[in-house]
């Protein structure tokens, strides 16, 4: 059986789809997947053994110059790639009108997705041949696992979902694997940031542990923050700019991770690494870290500035 997945973004949402592939792989011997995903996340599906072909899409970039000659050519090539094969099943796990109209509609095969009451944008359900009811009051991973089970005709396992990508990195770990922690300090929303003074206090509290700390970054202002956090601590390393695959390799070898609410915190969970995620205004209930050894540390008043470093340190030392 050949299946096309439409799950284009965000990083966390793409990662949250992986356990559903593992379920299907175990339920239907020989099943293979192609996957349409935003170009910035195209490395992720390739880490799962059940994925054959990754088809990058660039809707975010294309919409800035939709009718330019270059973008028209890219859109034509994308349409040809999506229509190159007729699929037994197409699963739109995105549930948005944009992806349904620009991607799912083009694909050849029976289209499955969530129904009017279940989809993130109800109008998206009009593009599907088969519509499934999936209750909203459950974690995003479980919703996607249920959608796949209904679309492919098996019972969703009751066990915790398995991302099944950690093994992709086991043979490529860095030489110092298990001897360092990673602090994921960068996120896109200001109210999700933990103050730099708190990060530095936590770094200081870990001095006696003998563990090294690595700080990744993705943009110049994040690099500048990482350098400020590391200043004066000889056991803290500011990493060079890295691809997503390279960051994943660093995370896969970490003894533990401390992160703000960001896509890389979900990548840490997908790699089965112990992680404490710091939450302020967001509710982790339906979209938080999913997996083994995923802990949450929340500010009492939803303001991360009021989450003491000592609280995070105590949780670290008691759990990891």
Listing of model-derived features with the role each one plays in the protein:
Residues 1-320:
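Catalytic machinery of carbohydrate-active enzymes
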């Amino acid at each position: 059986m050949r299946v096309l997945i439409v799950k284009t973004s965000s990083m966390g949402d793409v990662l949250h789809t992986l356990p559903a592939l593992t379920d299907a792989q175990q339920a239907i011997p020989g099943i293979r997947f192609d996957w349409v995903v935003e170009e910035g996340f195209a490395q992720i599906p390739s880490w799962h053994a059940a994925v054959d072909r990754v088809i990058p899409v660039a809707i975010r970039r294309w919409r800035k110059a939709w009718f330019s000659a270059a973008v028209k050519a890219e859109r034509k090539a994308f349409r040809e790639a999506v229509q190159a094969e007729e699929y037994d099943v197409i699963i739109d796990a995105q549930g948005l009108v944009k992806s349904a109209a620009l991607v799912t509609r083009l694909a050849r095969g029976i289209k499955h997705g969530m129904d009017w009451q279940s989809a993130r944008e109800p109008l998206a359900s009009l593009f599907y041949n088969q519509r499934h009811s999936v209750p909203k009051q459950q974690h995003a991973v479980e919703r996607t696992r249920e959608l796949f089970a209904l679309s492919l005709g098996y019972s969703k396992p009751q066990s915790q979902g398995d991302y099944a990508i950690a093994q992709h990195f086991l043979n490529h770990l860095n030489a110092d694997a298990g001897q360092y922690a990673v602090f994921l300090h960068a996120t896109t929303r200001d109210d999700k940031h933990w103050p730099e003074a708190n990060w530095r206090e936590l770094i200081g509290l870990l001095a006696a542990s003998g563990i090294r700390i690595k700080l990744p970054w993705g943009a110049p202002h994040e690099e500048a923050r990482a350098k400020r956090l590391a200043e004066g601590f000889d056991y803290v390393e500011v990493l060079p700019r890295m691809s997503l695959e390279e960051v994943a390799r660093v995370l896969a070898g970490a003894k533990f991770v401390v992160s703000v609410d960001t896509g890389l915190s979900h990548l840490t969970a997908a790699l089965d690494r112990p992680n404490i995620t710091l939450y302020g205004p967001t509710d982790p209930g339906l979209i938080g870290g999913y997996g083994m050894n995923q802990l949450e540390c929340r500010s009492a008043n939803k303001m991360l500035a009021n989450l003491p470093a000592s609280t995070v340190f105590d949780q670290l030392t008691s759990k990891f």
